[in-house]
UniProtKB/Swiss-Prot annotation:
Organism: Mycolicibacterium smegmatis (strain ATCC 700084 / mc(2)155)
GO MF entry, a single one: DNA binding
GO CC annotations on file: cytoplasm; DNA polymerase III complex
Protein's name according to its UniProt entry: Beta sliding clamp
Principal location class: cytoplasm
Assigned protein family: Belongs to the beta sliding clamp family.
Further remark: Strains that are resistant to griselimycin occur at a very low frequency (5 x 10(-10)) and are associated with amplification of a chromosomal segment containing this gene as well as the ori site (with a single point mutation in the promoter region), suggesting antibiotic resistance may be due to overexpression of the protein.
Listed Gene3D superfamilies: DNA Polymerase III, subunit A, domain 2 (3.10.150.10)
Biological-process GO terms, alphabetical: DNA strand elongation involved in DNA replication; response to antibiotic
Gene behind the chain: dnaN
SMART domains listed in its UniProt record: POL3Bc (SM00480)
């Protein structure tokens, strides 16, 4: 819980600059750009015998981090989060000394000195308590999985169901999914449940979850708290706890689209190619395409031809070797969405699965048996823990 007692105003501490700057920056990232009340733009600094706690809260998202510091005098103070973040990032690599003097905060680092106004700490809301822990996952796996699906999440706040990541929990199995209507990313993984036989599905803001996932990589494990038993998700809150950090976010009250029916069970054609060479070629060819315009992909037995542009803006083509099976195929995609998908695979090679040029294509990490298959379809969709489904762009004519 955050301390909001008005009497604690004589805070004084000394802290390592890098630790302080990193902690303030992490908390400040969750602060609202346009706070509904002035105090929500602040970060709360609280010093106790246990060290320094830095926290922020805007009624939607909370963030709290503990930092090792020499506390000369316990107390708490509220200051502008973004200003403090900018200052601490610019300080020299020397110890930082902070003290409260009346209604101002004095900050000294080497020969640099700052005097900042304080905000009304007594008006600052208490941070919400974390729900009961639901499960634990390795921090690097958590960060990778969230990053792979967050790339497909929508950014239009008028469509809240598309700005979230759907988290489906079934015992030790977790499925993450996100879509913006043009692409869909789905990742399956396992974790250690600490709340018994859990069956639940919640929708978490993608931006907040992605930030929390990146922050959790400095520890060994990430603890997720949604409640236990029948209460999972009922608080409308997700809590995330990792090494010295904890955060909460309100769940989205929206219905995520039914996505499993979009994943084809078989393909009429498949193609396998190196991710790096394809990505670089797409970037080159797309230089003549207007922003958001299409890049065409023509697949034949052993060649992929990339092309883009028109006579009035310029044309570009590039041929790449490819392992292809099925009838020759021409399909077009938004180049940005395509490279986003390739980058999220975390694989040296990608396998495309096609049905028709007007239907979504599936991108997945290539398996050992992919490539140089030959033959004709249909080809059953391979089992994989990650898929990126991408809508094509209508071809001219």
């Amino acid at each position: 819980m955050a301390t909001t007692t008005a009497g604690l105003t004589d805070l004084k501490f000394r802290v390592v600059r890098e630790d302080f700057a990193d902690a303030v920056a992490w908390v400040a990232r969750s602060l609202p750009t346009r706070p509904t009340i002035p105090v929500l733009a602040g970060v709360l600094l609280t010093g106790t015998d246990e060290g320094l706690t830095i926290s922020g809260f805007d009624y939607e998202v909370s963030a709290e981090v503990k930092v090792s510091a020499e506390i000369a005098s316990a107390g708490s103070v509220l200051v502008s989060g973004r200003l403090l973040s900018d200052i601490t990032k610019a300080l020299p690599a020397k110890p930082v000394e902070v003290s409260v003097e009346g209604t101002r905060v004095s900050l000294t680092c080497g020969s640099a000195r700052f005097s900042l106004p304080t905000l009304a700490v007594e008006d600052y809301p208490a941070l919400p308590a974390l729900p009961e822990e639901t499960g634990v996952i390795a921090s690097d796996l958590f960060a990778e999985a969230i990053g792979q699906v967050a790339v497909a999440a929508g950014r239009d706040d008028t469509l809240p169901m598309l700005t979230g990541i759907r988290v489906e929990i079934s015992g030790e199995s977790v499925v993450l999914a996100a879509t913006d209507r043009f692409r869909l990313a789905v990742r399956e993984l396992t974790w250690v449940t600490t709340a018994g036989d859990v069956e639940a599905a919640v929708l978490v803001p993608a931006k907040t979850l992605a930030e929390a996932a990146k922050a959790g990589t400095d520890g060994n494990q990430v603890h997720l708290a949604l409640g236990s038993g029948a209460s999972v998700g009922k608080d409308g809150l997700l809590g995330i706890r990792s090494e010295g950090k904890r955060s909460t976010t309100r769940l989205l009250d929206a219905e995520f689209p039914k996505f499993r029916q979009l994943l084809p069970a078989e393909h009429t054609a498949v193609a396998t190619i190196g991710v790096a060479e394809l990505t670089e070629a797409i970037k080159r060819v797309a230089l003549v395409a207007d922003r958001g315009a299409q890049i065409r992909m023509e697949f034949s037995d052993d060649t992929l031809k990339l092309s883009a542009g028109a006579d009035d803006v310029g044309r570009a083509e590039e041929d790449l070797p490819v392992d292809f099976a099925g009838e020759p195929l021409t399909i077009a995609f938004n180049p940005t969405y395509l490279t986003d998908g390739l980058g999220s695979l975390h694989s040296e090679r990608v396998t495309f699965g096609f049905t028709t040029p007007s239907r979504p294509a599936v991108l997945r990490p290539a398996g050992e048996d992919d490539g140089a298959n030959g033959g004709s379809g249909p080809f059953p969709a391979a089992k994989t823990d990650y898929v990126y489904l991408l809508m094509p762009v209508r071809l001219p004519g």
